[in-house]
From Swiss-Prot:
GO terms for biological process: negative regulation of translation; positive regulation of neuron projection development; proteasomal ubiquitin-independent protein catabolic process; protein ubiquitination. It comes from Mus musculus (Mouse). The lineage of its organism: Eukaryota, Metazoa, Chordata, Craniata, Vertebrata. CDD domains: BACK_KLHL37_ENC1, BTB_POZ_KLHL37_ENC1. Ubiquitinated by E3 ubiquitin ligase complex formed by CUL3 and RBX1 and probably targeted for proteasome-independent degradation. Quinone-induced oxidative stress increases its ubiquitination. Actin-binding protein involved in the regulation of neuronal process formation and in differentiation of neural crest cells. Down-regulates transcription factor NF2L2/NRF2 by decreasing the rate of protein synthesis and not via a ubiquitin-mediated proteasomal degradation mechanism. The gene is Enc1. GO terms for cellular component: chromatin; Cul3-RING ubiquitin ligase complex; cytoplasm; cytoskeleton; neuronal cell body; nuclear matrix; nucleoplasm. Kelch repeats lie at residues 296-340, 341-388, 389-444, 446-492, 494-538, 539-585. Pfam families: BACK, BTB, Kelch_KLHDC2_KLHL20_DRC7. This is Ectoderm-neural cortex protein 1. Residues 46-114 form the BTB domain. SUPFAM superfamilies: Kelch motif (SSF117281), POZ domain (SSF54695).
């Protein structure tokens, strides 16, 4: 009887215009959770007791397993715990923190504040409440400060909170003067102290502070840490210390004189220092290499795209100051800095002839000289420094020359220049020829991003050169096909900005040079094609470029800690930037 009635109803419904009706009550999940929470509070149908401190919490296994992989594994495994009706956390988790986690499990809500954020993050990670862990990390990111960034660095490292770690790390680098006085600094593990003090981005212009911080860390637990002294000394740019301080304070330090390896490190630094003071050749030792905060920014440009002048960017005064005329004006060249020198390679002159020439500007002595010419005349190429050598990558060349190619074909050829021998050498060619690519070095490798391919298309590839193996690979693709972009490096992150499309011209990304992963960052302040970028200290600077007929007139700065771009100053209208480099500022005496 019931079947026939059902069939009759179905038959009547089928004659209408609506055959299916999906009913969904949006508040249903909330109402179920609310009722489950009420059942928990009344201890109805609960099947497990959680103990923390002196408190006990009755719960439903199914609810806990649904929101925590930790409990899911515990209750579904074949171990003893899966059959137990009680779980005892003892003192491994505070009862008030466990109560907050359980309230979240039964309500999907929790209040995070300054008092509980760290404890909640730790407990959320321990019990695998991933949403809670991530929410607490986001809260702590927004409340990051120079006074707490060291603690956040340790916390995020212990619990794999990647973004919180990166932001804390950047803030530590940017606020070294503050964090070195913090008690947390003295309690950092050895590997983290070494990583911090050796960083190129550590913001200090006085290496005495780095040396004193290293010695303070050693002395804090001398018995256990004395063996790390040689490694800590190698993080200090000892040859950049004032000569008197190096000779009288460092070389005479008892902890150093009593340890053979440490003594040898200081003696080598003294030899480098004397070589610098006597201007006796090129000093390439790490102990004599200024950090990026000890760098000066130089802009190359002119009143047209024909570059004829070099300018100094005064970051403090926010001024762009003319410094020197370029001996041979040119366009579509590439510029790169090694130490205190700016290398200008190739390009096209006023007659549009493609050049092999290499001009070198010594910022210390403020004079130009000519280096050995490249093996291939080229323009539209990229250049970067790697292990104290200059590399030129891709570009176009003329129809005649050492390695002939049509002017319309992008080159595969890559050359290496050694400043100590003044000689050029061919190295392994690119996997695909490119021009107008963004070329940088990071983590002892060269990277070429995008560019114009041999077939005139925008290349959506990242090409990577391994100097040890002398070969190029393609470890990743770009988020979009790119050319006329700019790139600059902070640590293991390569930042790419600008481009020749409506979208890419205002976008910016960062590329991890170790994992080859891309992350979108804040958009630049203005659309830019053919812009130029450098890193200085813990920040990025971008200048120049245009979009359509509109020229970009500002010098902008990006702070990765805040993920924010700001305009620093206005570029004179009469100046069209064509290259941007960062050199060593000085070699202190």
């Amino acid at each position: 009887m019931s079947v026939s009635v059902h069939e009759n109803r179905k038959s009547r419904a089928s004659s209408g215009s609506i055959n299916i009706y999906l009913f969904h009550k949006s508040s249903y999940a909330d109402s179920v959770l609310t009722h489950l929470n009420l059942l928990r509070q009344q201890r109805l149908f609960t099947d497990v007791l959680l103990h923390a401190g002196n408190r006990t919490f009755p719960c439903h296994r199914a609810v806990l397993a649904a929101c925590s992989r930790y409990f899911e594994a515990m209750f579904s495994g074949g171990l003893k715990e899966s059959q137990d009706s009680e779980v005892n956390f003892d003192n491994s988790i505070h009862p008030e923190v466990l109560e907050l986690l359980l309230d979240y499990a039964y309500s999907s809500r929790v209040i995070i504040n300054e008092e509980n954020a760290e404890s909640l993050l730790e407990a959320g990670d321990m019990l695998e409440f991933q949403d809670i862990r991530d929410a607490c990390a986001e809260f702590l990111e927004k409340n990051l400060h120079p006074t707490n960034c060291l603690g956040m660095l340790l916390l995020s490292d212990a619990h794999q909170c990647t973004k919180l770690y990166e932001l804390s790390w950047r803030m530590c680098l940017s606020n070294f003067q503050t964090i070195r006085k913090n008690e947390d600094f003295l309690q950092l593990p050895q590997d983290m102290v070494v990583q911090l003090l050796s960083s190129e981005e550590l913001e200090t212009e006085d290496e005495r502070l780095v040396y004193e911080s290293a010695m303070n860390w050693i002395s804090y637990d001398l018995k256990k840490r004395y063996c790390y002294l040689p490694e800590l000394l190698q993080t200090v740019r000892l040859a950049l210390l004032p000569a008197i301080y190096l000779m009288e304070n460092v070389a005479m330090e008892e902890l150093i004189t009593k340890q053979r390896k440490s003594k040898e490190i200081v003696e080598e630094a003294i030899r480098c220092k004397l070589k610098i003071l006597q201007n006796d050749g090129v000093v390439t030792s790490l102990c004599a290499r200024p950090r990026k905060t000890g760098h000066a920014l130089f802009l190359l440009g002119g009143q047209t795209f024909m570059c004829d002048k070099l300018y100094l960017v005064d970051q403090k005064a926010k001024e762009i100051i003319p410094k020197a005329d370029i001996p041979s004006p040119r366009k579509e060249f590439s510029a790169c800095a090694i130490g205190c020198k700016v290398y200008i390679t190739g390009g096209r002159g006023s007659e549009n002839g493609v050049s092999k020439d290499v001009w070198v500007y010594d910022t210390l002595h403020e004079e130009w000289s000519k280096a050995a010419p490249m093996l291939v005349a080229r323009f539209g190429h990229g250049s970067a420094e790697l292990k104290h050598c200059l590399y030129v990558v891709g570009g176009h060349t003329a129809a005649t020359g050492c390695l002939p190619a049509s002017p319309s074909v992008s080159l595969k050829q890559v050359e290496q220049y050694d400043p100590t021998t003044n000689k050029w050498t061919m190295v392994a060619p690119l996997r695909e020829g490119v021009s107008n690519a963004a070329v940088v070095s990071a983590k002892l490798k060269l990277f070429a991003f995008g560019g114009t391919s041999v077939s005139h298309d925008k290349l959506p590839k990242v090409q990577c050169y391994d100097q040890c193996e002398n070969r190029w690979s393609v470890p990743a693709t770009c988020p979009q096909p790119w050319r006329y972009t700019a790139a600059a490096v902070l640590g293991n992150q390569i930042f790419i900005m600008g481009g020749d499309t409506e979208f890419s011209a205002c976008s910016a990304y960062k590329f991890n040079s170790e994992t080859y992963q891309w992350t979108k960052v804040g958009d630049v302040t203005a659309k830019r094609m053919s812009c130029h970028a450098v890193a200085s200290g813990n920040k990025l600077y971008v200048v120049g470029g245009y979009f359509g007929i509109q020229r970009c007139k500002t010098l902008d700065c990006y702070d990765p800690t805040l993920d924010v771009w700001n305009s620093i100053t206005t570029v004179p209208y009469s100046l069209i930037p064509t290259a941007f480099v960062s050199t060593w500022k000085h070699l202190p005496s």
